[in-house]
């Protein structure tokens, strides 16, 4: 048994032919570069790529397996060097039961399963090549299909104001759109942590996941999970979600919710926090506010005490957020310590200070221990570390 880090929500920006998959994703976010980044620079051993339904992604994986670059694992997933790729698909549900669009993650055990799932999807999506497409099928039928194929069904960034389960998807309960028995886990999203979500009793049965939702290489690993498993593959991941046979989620590492883009209710135009009772922004006069995750959770919360034991949640500040850590400094740190995970979790302050200025080393250690002062984000603008 061993401990591994897992980030299970990574997009592909472009295929090997240059075709767009996630239109808002970086052009450098290709399959090859993602796997190199995760394996050699980030230290992520289990990586969920959630655009694997796209035909050109499937083709690239097939060719990589044929050439020996990639290797299919008996337990499910595809191995590249020290990283296992989990085959995932992000889909948008907006059926008659929904109050708004909902994004979900689906994972399949093998490439053959994902290819079969992609064929099934092709009759239900307008463009099978693109990411996060609306599926013209009910959420319940999608859940049934995933379960029948031995896959995993995980609602994504469930409190984010746009395109999520509790953002706009349901009025108050997940049972409005889903069969609760066919949900394997829920992904919290960047503006929420375990303490916040644990006050919603309908989530008690489900493990929490913290993932990056990376749209660029640098964002891989900004949120991740620590798992205790026998090996990095689909079967072991599924066991860890269920807490079976000693497999488990040890910890969730995520942004302090204050750093998220939607923590507090704020003006969409300028990011100014909303003032209770005001209908227009005090700063710019616009009347467009995005409800913050913290306010939405106050509406949904129905238990004061946390009743389900949960893995510890570690407020993690990505190195890119730390003042003084630009691209060149980040490269120096990775060359000295190997991966970002090693810098964030293992490097002693005195060792860091041999590579970067002592002030920067001290900030990295403070970021690791959650001792930095933060300014809350909202309205689509990230929070910041206060000077």
Curated annotation (Swiss-Prot):
Coiled coil: none
CDD domains, sorted: PfuEndoQ-like
Domain of life: Bacteria
InterPro entries (alphabetical): CHP00375, Pol/histidinol_Pase-like, RuvA_2-like
Annotated family: To M.jannaschii MJ0043 N-terminal region.
UniProt cross-references to PANTHER family, sorted A to Z: PHOSPHOHYDROLASE, PHP FAMILY, PHOSPHOTRANSFERASE
Protein name: Uncharacterized protein YqxK
Lineage: Bacteria, Bacillati, Bacillota, Bacilli, Bacillales
């Amino acid at each position: 048994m061993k401990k591994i880090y897992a980030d299970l929500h990574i997009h592909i920006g472009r295929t090997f032919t240059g075709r767009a998959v996630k239109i808002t994703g970086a052009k450098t976010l290709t399959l090859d570069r993602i796997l190199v980044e995760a394996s050699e620079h980030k230290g992520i051993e289990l990586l969920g790529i959630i655009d694997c339904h796209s035909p050109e992604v499937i083709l690239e994986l097939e060719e990589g397996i044929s050439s020996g670059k990639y290797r299919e694992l008996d337990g499910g997933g595809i191995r590249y060097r020290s990283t296992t790729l989990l085959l995932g698909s992000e889909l948008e549900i907006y059926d008659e039961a929904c109050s708004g669009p909902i994004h979900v993650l689906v994972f399949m055990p093998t490439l053959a399963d994902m290819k079969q799932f992609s064929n099934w999807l092709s009759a239900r999506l307008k463009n099978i090549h693109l990411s996060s497409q609306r599926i013209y099928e009910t959420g319940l039928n999608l859940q049934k299909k995933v379960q029948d194929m031995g896959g995993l069904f995980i609602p994504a960034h469930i409190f984010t104001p746009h395109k999520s389960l509790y953002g706009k998807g349901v009025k108050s309960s997940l049972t409005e759109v889903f069969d609760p028995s066919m949900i394997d886990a829920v992904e919290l999203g960047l503006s929420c942590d375990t303490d916040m979500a644990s006050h919603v009793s309908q989530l008690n049965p489900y493990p929490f996941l913290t993932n990056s939702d990376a749209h660029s290489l640098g964002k891989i690993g900004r949120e991740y999970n620590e798992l205790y498993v026998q090996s990095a593959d689909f079967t072991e991941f599924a066991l860890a979600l269920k807490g079976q046979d000693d497999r488990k989620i040890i910890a969730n590492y995520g942004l302090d919710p204050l750093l998220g883009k939607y923590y507090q209710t704020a003006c969409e135009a300028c990011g100014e926090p909303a003032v209770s009772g005001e209908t227009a922004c005090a700063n710019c006069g616009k009347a467009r506010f995005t409800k913050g995750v913290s306010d939405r959770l106050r509406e949904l919360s129905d238990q004061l005490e946390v009743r389900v034991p949960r893995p510890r949640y570690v407020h993690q500040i990505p190195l890119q957020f730390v003042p003084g850590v630009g691209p060149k400094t980040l490269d120096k740190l990775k060359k000295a310590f190997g991966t970002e995970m090693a810098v964030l979790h293992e490097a002693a302050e005195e060792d860091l200070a041999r590579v970067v200025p002592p002030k920067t080393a001290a900030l990295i250690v403070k970021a690791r221990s959650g001792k930095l002062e933060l300014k809350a984000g909202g309205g689509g603008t990230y929070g910041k570390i206060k000077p």
